[in-house]
């Protein structure tokens, strides 16, 4: 593919607004429901998380509700995904650490005749570029791809701007735990919070959880 082709071919993955839940429990239920829905449509599902603790909680929730899944513990390449998606009759849920995705592959034109897949991310990172890397990975697959991020108001990133006031307002407006919040305004707030956190970043030391990452790398904003 030439440079000009990058601006004239179909490259983008489907990226709906983030789904934001009132509580971690509601988020997990929403994740499980969406995974089930995709499996019912015979789709291959890739579940990602930036932190091991988050991915373990999702795996536990899927297992408890009878949704089979498996961990992929090594680096996941574009070729790996193609082989897994194209396995006849093998519709599965693969759990992967987001950091194991390659970031050095070029985007490919989407071939609509190929089997598609869904990518669900169980959190957003404090550093926007790490989320963008997942989107970039989806663009390298060359097949139909839907990418959805799930968050809760209790996520450390969300606490940087939401606080208890937003939770209380939503409850007064009749917002139930079974319904997710969507909207461009919240998306802008998330992006702004990520930019603010990145400006105070001292390091990028690995961590098992979002809370630990914040304490290690941006202690001034630890919640």
What residue ranges belong to the model's regions?
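A short, basic N-terminal segment
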Residues: 1-14
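Conserved interdomain hinge at the start of the Helicase C-terminal
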Residues: 12-63
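Conserved beta-strand segments of the P-loop GTPase G domain that flank and frequently precede/overlap
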Residues: 46-50, 71-73, 94-99, 119-124, ...
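Short acidic, S/G/P-rich loop/turn micro-motifs used as interaction or catalytic elements
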Residues: 52-56, 74-79, 99-106, 123-130, ...
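A generic structural motif
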Residues: 69-82, 96-97, 146-154, 176-188
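Conserved motor-coupling elements within RecA-like helicase/translocase cores
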Residues: 70-117
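Conserved segment of the helicase C-terminal RecA-like domain
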Residues: 122, 126, 130-181
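Non-catalytic, charged low-complexity extensions flanking SF2 helicase motor domains
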Residues: 162, 167-223
